[in-house]
Swiss-Prot record:
GO terms for molecular function: ATP binding; metal ion binding; pyridoxal kinase activity. It catalyses: pyridoxal + ATP = pyridoxal 5'-phosphate + ADP + H(+). Its main location: cytoplasm. ATP binds at residues 183-184, 211-223. The gene is BUD16. This is Putative pyridoxal kinase BUD16. Gene3D superfamilies: 3.40.1190.20. It comes from the Eukaryota. It is an enzyme of class 2 (transferase). It is found in: Cytoplasm; Nucleus. Keywords: ATP-binding, Cell cycle, Cytoplasm, Kinase, Metal-binding, Nucleotide-binding, Nucleus, Transferase, Zinc. Required for synthesis of pyridoxal-5-phosphate from vitamin B6. Important for bud site selection.
Amino acid sequence: MPRLLATQSHVVHGYVGNKAATFPLQCLGWDVDCCNSVQFSNHTGYGLDKVFGTITRETDLKELLSGLFDNFSQDYQALLSGYLPNKNSVRCMGTYYAKFKEANPEMIWLMDPVMGDEGQLYVSEDVIPEYRKLALSPKQLVDIITPNQFELEILYGGEIKTKEHLKKALKKLHQTIPVIIVTSCDCKMFDDKDFIYCVASMEGKTPIVYRVPFIDSYFTGVGDLFSALLLDRVYKILSNPTTTLKFEDQVNNVLNVIQKVLKITRSYASGKMKAKMGSALEMKEMELRLIESRDIYETINIHQTDYIYARL
């Protein structure tokens, strides 16, 4: 059974961060160890005045990761990092994840550089240099990143307004990162606002554009679930040189699973409710139904829709 260390947020109620990643990965046969970067009552979509809890101090995070490295440096097959609240926590995570990678170069690290979306930062600007150091490290520590377009622009260091800009950004980051999944791209770059566009790129191969129907509601934890499922699928490819699994098919499968989870979640909501930020009642209704979706995480368990749209 493969083992994974995940460092990201934790909520007591609901499903984001480690709460969104752990159960699906366990269903897929992973032994998951969670290191929580924050511990909140619920996610921030309920409204900032309805979130209670604490940020894990750098000294505490360091002590936890240090202990895990000293005791289990050879025990993990994969590393996952998601939301980290400040530059010190990013730096601390990066320092220890680098040690894990140096101790076991076969370990796969997926980094979700959570910084913001649609031109707005969720974190302080001093987090940016820390993520850029990790993404652009000549040591090539990170194997997979899952930024949205805004986060990709930050890592790349320039605006992305055309497909050519996108290809240049991917080419630059592929100098240090083998697998890049841009989880959402500006629909203006393509042709239809009724769809979400995702771009998957593996070093040395033509980037693939996926087009997924837009579900008109606000969900939280989707990116965390996506990263967890993607890590599982890519691990199955990279850890088995004789595999017949194809990268583009595995990404397509993850998108199918995500769509199915969102539809299941929507089906439990009252009437035609669609959640929006700051509405506690609506957010409660739209918490991801991960337990109800437990039978669909495996590739073979759901009907596959081909979301491949184009190649860059």
